[in-house]
Amino acid sequence: MKELLVTIAAGLVDEPEKVTVDVDDINDEGVIVYHLHVAADDMGRVIGKQGRIAKAIRTVMRATANRNDQKIMVEIA
């Protein structure tokens, strides 16, 4: 899952070497939290107009997680 998120984000940004993902352990609600970090200049590319790109990334990640019976949340920082 982490590799998928890095691959998606790296394809969107100008500085793919600065894309990192931190993963939190499962919280009390059974949710795994992924923290996506990109360069400040690339933040707009990852979020997109009105958050459309961010929503699409979260949708793909949730669909993949559902196939594995997991609950996830993606935070972009």
Labelled PLM ranges:
Residues M1-R45, K49, K55-A77:
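RNA-contacting regions in translation and RNA-metabolism proteins
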